[in-house]
Amino acid sequence: VRSVLNKNSIWHNTQRNLRRQNFSDKSVYKVMKQLYQYTHKHFVTFPVAYWSQTPQGDSLLVSGRVYLPKYRILNGIIVANHYTMTADEEVPSNRLSMEMVYLLKGYAVIMPDYVGYGLSRDEIHPYLHWRSAAQTAVDLLNCMPELLDYYGYSYPKDVVVTGYSQGGAVA
């Protein structure tokens, strides 16, 4: 586990978030070890880059994260829109997320970072502009047929859109 905890990895950021929640070093190590072993056995996850738009309608390269169960039959896709985040290290492309629990039921999970985070961190995050945040989710979902085909998955018939806090407004 320690070999993958480089400064900018999702593992490092997940570990840092556990420490911020007052987990002891021993507990953090135990959780990270189990999480690492589980993830490599049951699912794959990777950051993605794709085109979306700024609130003004200009094209912009943005990022997000995709989680796929290792078996090739999907029950559906969950578009999980995240809550308000204040630091780039917290966004989906830079850490593991609790929304990956949907993998246990055979769902792919996709999570956009939103404009102003991840690859678009140089842009101002338009916090109350729900339409631009929703556009990043729609554009990520529109990438899924090609991405799933590339990795050998069939496109499922069900798509569920969910979110919490800011993500609830986006959904």
Region annotations inferred by a language model:
Residues 152-165:
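Alpha/beta-hydrolase fold nucleophile elbow
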Residues 127-150:
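Alpha/beta-hydrolase active-site loop
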Residues 1-43:
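N-terminal targeting or regulatory segments adjacent to alpha/beta-hydrolase or S9 domains
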Residues 55-63, 67-105, 113:
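Short, surface-exposed "cap/lid" segments of acyl-processing enzymes
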Residues 135, 163-171:
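Glycine-rich nucleophile elbow surrounding the catalytic serine of serine-hydrolase chemistry
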Residues 28-76:
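N-terminal cap/lid segment of alpha/beta-hydrolase-fold proteins
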Residues 116-126:
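Glycine-rich "HGGG/HGxG" loop immediately N-terminal to the catalytic nucleophile
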